[in-house]
Design a protein with these regions (language model features):
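Structured, acidic catalytic/metal-binding patches in enzyme active sites
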Residues: 2-197
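A short, acidic, amphipathic alpha-helical segment used as a generic capping/interface helix at domain edges
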Residues: 197-217
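C-terminal structured interaction module
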Residues: 210, 218-249
Length: 249
């Protein structure tokens, strides 16, 4: 979960973007990783993606989804805020947001680190632009999005269960267990979604991380833990030796 790229000043940390509200504390090894770093690298700027959640004109999302999926989503969708109205969202935005409406969560690693980086004047940058994130998400086939939403609506308790199990594995720093939990998640099992969210982005990120390997600054690269496990993970794509960093009490 926390790796040193051998012979460099770069480390790699697998994060959780959201924590269960029942387990909100940042673990000590994550705090230690932040304290070690003189500079940080994150996936992307979440705030910069918000303007892309909605379409500019065109047909309502209602016309892209199966009638029953639309009916059930629309009945429980927030009536205000960045996700409203449902009809204006891009299909991938509805798919990404829908599970969080079934979860009891608090912010995860990245927002906390970003605030602390600003407080301590630590520099940071991103592995991808908002436009690149959106291009990846736009590549998800509509059929996969519809299937993912149907699977979600078939068991609205699954997102919270999966989050809690994944966070428990993450707190143990057990990458294999994280992957095993994710593999049981219906959405993760859909190749079109997995490829866009994980595989393709890992491919794009690897050369950008490699470019940073010569930095004299202690640099911490923070990506979602799922990017570090399974076939085609970021460590594999880097083609560079890494060492697990032991946790010091």
């Amino acid at each position: 979960m926390y790796f040193q790229l051998t012979g460099t000043h770069v480390r790699l940390l697998g994060s959780m973007h959201l924590f269960s509200a029942a387990s909100p504390r940042t673990p000590a090894w994550v705090v230690q990783a932040f304290d070690w770093a003189e500079a940080l690298v994150f996936e992307s700027d979440a705030q910069a993606i918000l303007p892309f959640l909605k379409r500019e004109g065109g047909q309502s999302l209602e016309h892209a989804l199966p009638p029953e999926v639309w009916r059930r989503l629309d009945a429980s969708w927030p009536s205000a805020g960045v996700l409203a109205p449902l009809g204006e969202l891009r299909p991938w935005a509805a798919m990404m947001a829908a599970p969080t409406l079934c979860q009891r969560v608090v912010e995860g690693v990245e927002p906390r680190m970003l605030r602390e980086a600003a407080t301590q004047a630590k520099p940071y940058w991103y592995l991808e632009t908002a436009e690149e994130v959106v291009a990846s998400l736009e590549s998800i086939p509509l059929s996969a999005i519809c299937t993912g939403l149907e699977l979600l609506l078939a068991d609205l308790t699954e997102p919270q269960r999966t989050l809690e199990r994944m966070q428990a594995a993450w707190l143990r720093r057990d990458l294999q267990s994280i992957y095993d939990v994710a593999a049981e998640s219906p959405i993760f099992s859909l190749a079109g979604i997995r490829s866009a969210i994980l595989d393709g982005r890992n491919c794009a990120w690897a050369p950008r991380v490699r470019e940073a390997l010569g930095t004299p600054k202690r640099t911490l690269v923070v990506v979602g833990a799922l990017h570090l496990c399974g076939e085609g993970n970021l460590i594999e794509r880097l083609q560079y030796p890494v060492e697990q960093i032991p946790f010091c009490d």
